[in-house]
């Protein structure tokens, strides 16, 4: 036997199909519901479960929209549909009913035609329920369902923040444009005022109050400017190099000043509104990064829910996509931060610590966004706790740098830096003080010293190689020093011997020249004359 489940605003109805053979011909099923009598021959009401109130109806319909049976529907089917085949309009609902209640469910074109026919003759198939009763029920349920959907819409509040931050950025651009226009326009008449007053709002207020610069000496600017700036303004107005302007020009300049002031007032109101909305919707995110940065992150992500699905690495560079893709294309270093760079925590950090702090802040920001988007609590305790942790980490990083600068780094200074002759072994401590080597005193020529330098270098290299190859056979430092001293003395003695030999040869040569006889000198002179002739 086939039973048809039909959902209405008044309750659930089960209809029994009298002639199941007609379901085979789908095209002719619609003809069976042309009249109430033919419809009664096709189906018959078996059971009806009425909703007690609107809240019960809303709960049941909300479950059906999700593809799941409500608690009342499960009880109704268990009581009236055991061992029967159930025809349903939603295949997903049929799968859940079959899995949980063990009731066979069908869903095909014939079932849809049956439901269409039942809908057309519903008030005739159920006695005591007319259109005048069903219409207000349907209207009330539709309104309740609309409110339910709006209540749990993920985009209902994000839109306000996205539009507010977008308008705030546009107002900043307009304010800057209008303020610069006022400065350029009024600068022809009073150019010195631009250097005296740097703030755009104060500049517009002063221009609106003063008008022509001649009036500056008679006016009181104490409500707008400080005493020193007011004195400078009045002094500059007397000796100004600007040109004269007509009253019509001043009228338009003052109207532009009114526009600047009205825009600045509205911007302040809009900022207060954005601040209140951010504290209500995303309190933890606001506690970590502030109202403006948090609102820009939500606007860039599309919504708070979409932003909560992003990992920390994506949130860290959100807003720097152009730089990221350029770096990937050119194979350079990728950016370390995007919109999160404007957070106060990143701004407080030193330049070399900004990357670390932005990475930590992005990780905590993602956690805060997920709590705000999916959590039930509306307080900002989690955001304040994470902010305190990040501030402690920042102080820790700065403290390490201060410790390195002041000399309080980890470990003690290595004594090898100050005494290179110290041995690294357990028995090798600081070597004894060096004594003056008297054997090294000698009068040597520059050439002999130069010739000795390469030989000494070679000897040192050979000794180093031997020491590296046989580290285990190292002798105590005192013996090595004695050997070095002996080698140096031997080298000096050899050089001294060579010098003595050279001096002896020179002396012999001089003696031979002095011992020559005058006869030999005459013979030499005669030989020279003959050679000339």
UniProtKB/Swiss-Prot annotation:
Residues 401-433, 445-533 are annotated as: Disordered. It is found in: Nucleus, Nucleolus. Residues 521-533 have a biased composition (Basic residues). GO terms for cellular component: box C/D methylation guide snoRNP complex; nucleolus; small-subunit processome. Residues 413-424 have a biased composition (Basic and acidic residues). Disulfide bonds: none annotated. It comes from the Eukaryota. It holds the Pfam family Nop. Gene3D superfamilies: 1.10.287.4070, Nop domain. The keyword Nucleus applies. GO terms for molecular function: mRNA binding; snoRNA binding. GO terms for biological process: ribosome biogenesis. Keywords: Nucleus, Ribosome biogenesis. Signal peptide: none annotated. InterPro entries: Nop56/Nop58, NOP58/56_N, Nop_C, Nop_dom, Nop_dom_sf, NOSIC. Residues 281-399 form the Nop domain. Required for 60S ribosomal subunit biogenesis. Belongs to the NOP5/NOP56 family. This is Probable nucleolar protein 5-2. It comes from Arabidopsis thaliana (Mouse-ear cress). The lineage of its organism: Eukaryota, Viridiplantae, Streptophyta, Embryophyta, Tracheophyta. The gene is NOP5-2.
